[in-house]
Amino acid sequence: EADFCLLATPVASLERQLAAVWAALPARALVTDVGSTKRRIVATAEGLAAGRPLAFVGGHPMAGSERAGFAEARADLFEGATVILTPTERTPPDAVTRVRSFWEAVGGRVTVLDPTTHDRAVAAVSHLPHLVADALMDAVLRMDPAFLDVAARGFRDTTRIAAASPEIWREIFLDN
């Protein structure tokens, strides 16, 4: 009888997972997510909401690293991190309040954007920089992988995020 569900799966599987939990949760439950893109998942949730009285508030904590897996977990990951919520005019205000309270309780600084503005903003400040880092690393590796032996901190800082999961980032790029 869960009344709050947070989906933390790759972008490509969010719709499928959302449909599954939507069917399983009791009426009036609240669902949120941590996906990097919002337009599609919010539209899917609003379509599902037409059939069952559950609420969805899209969420995106701007936190994390290029590392993945349980061994890389950090208790302080969300402290001071911006968390973007993406309600629409159909989102119940009390649902937004509950999700905001959740994120603030773990140290997040909540801001609210509509799904389209969210996707445009994170494309500019997160997705494009990641693509640039990938392209830079790819270019250097194609020139001569030995060049990495003389790379200094600036290059490593610029390309650190290129070490993130290419599968996850492929999904993000395709969705936004």
Model-inferred region functions:
Residues 159-175:
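NAD(P)-dependent Rossmann-like dehydrogenase/reductase catalytic/cofactor-binding core
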Residues 19-71:
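Rossmann-like NAD(P)(H) cofactor-binding subdomain of soluble oxidoreductases
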Residues 14, 38, 66, 91-92:
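Alpha-helix N-cap/loop-to-helix initiation residues
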Residues 75-163:
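Internal alpha-helical scaffold of NAD(P)-dependent oxidoreductase catalytic cores
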Residues 72-77, 170-171:
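Short, flexible, solvent-exposed loop/turn segments with mixed acidic/basic and small polar residues
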Residues 1-30:
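Rossmann-like NAD(P)-binding element
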Residues 8-10, 35, 87, 135:
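Glycine-rich, N-terminal phosphate-binding loop of Rossmann-like dinucleotide-binding domains
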